[in-house]
Amino acid sequence: MPRPSPCADSGGGMMTTLTARPEAITFDPQQSALIVVDMQNAYATPGGYLDLAGFDVSTTRPVIANIQTAVTAARAAGMLIIWFQNGWDEQYVEAGGPGSPNFHKSNALKTMRKQPQLQGKLLAKGSWDYQLVDELVPQPGDIVLPKPRYSGFFNTPLDSILRSRGIRHLVFTGIATNVCVESTLRDGFFLEYFGVVLEDATHQAGPEFVQKAALFNIETFFGWVSDVETFCDALSPTSFARIA
């Protein structure tokens, strides 16, 4: 059943143009999705996995607020909201054993091997670490998807969910820009999706230059980069043009 929108009626779809780098991009919000990547305590809260693994999460609060703003605007415009949660079962079977590169490269798994007292606490489904931050709450009509790897397209129904709804444009927010956000956007690019990142609604894992490098990669090779204020302006009723 189509999602309602205050910006369109039965006369046809509505298009808007988002100012972005390297150039503006035009899309129909009702055939687009806002994707919120891994806004879990693990990635955005002191005491979560990233913090315990030695990454700086002290500047994530503005990102949370900006995501709230973007979600509100997207929902009002009739965009599908998709929330990802990264993690595994309590026994970490889904994480893969020594035969998986994920076993060797996941900083969560490596941190637990170094600190056995954390075993079962990091990114385990049902744990505080796995939960979305308190400020971000999915609403009826949103879709919440678990994912076992960095990319939201790997071993998830994301592609079929999007294709069944005719969605081709994806707007990304979340953490970490240089890991799960970029991985999902890149995989989407290879599957013919148009990906946009809202830079002030994302946060990197690592130094500030990592954020800049990820955004450079995205705007140069794989997608587009904009910001929350510009995104919200593009979704205001005065910004829409009707398509036949």
Swiss-Prot record:
Active site (record annotation): 38 (proton acceptor), 147, 180 (nucleophile)
Keywords attached to this entry: Hydrolase
Keyword Iron-sulfur: no
SUPFAM superfamilies hit by this protein: Isochorismatase-like hydrolases
InterPro entries: Isochorismatase-like_dom, Isochorismatase-like_hydrls, Isochorismatase-like_sf, RutB
KW Hydrolase (keyword) present: yes
Main enzyme class: hydrolase
Entry GO MF terms: hydrolase activity, acting on carbon-nitrogen (but not peptide) bonds, in linear amides
Induction comment: Up-regulated by the nitrogen regulatory protein C (NtrC also called GlnG) and repressed by RutR.
GO biological process, one term: nitrogen utilization
Reaction(s) this enzyme catalyzes, per UniProt: (Z)-3-ureidoacrylate + H2O + H(+) = (Z)-3-aminoacrylate + NH4(+) + CO2; (Z)-3-ureidoacrylate + H2O = (Z)-3-aminoacrylate + carbamate + H(+); (Z)-2-methylureidoacrylate + H2O + H(+) = (Z)-2-methylaminoacrylate + NH4(+) + CO2
Family: Belongs to the isochorismatase family. RutB subfamily.
PANTHER family per the UniProt record, alphabetical: ISOCHORISMATASE-LIKE DOMAIN-CONTAINING PROTEIN, PEROXYUREIDOACRYLATE/UREIDOACRYLATE AMIDOHYDROLASE-RELATED
Protein name in UniProt: Ureidoacrylate amidohydrolase RutB
Protein's organism: Escherichia coli O55:H7 (strain CB9615 / EPEC)
Gene transcribed to yield this protein: rutB
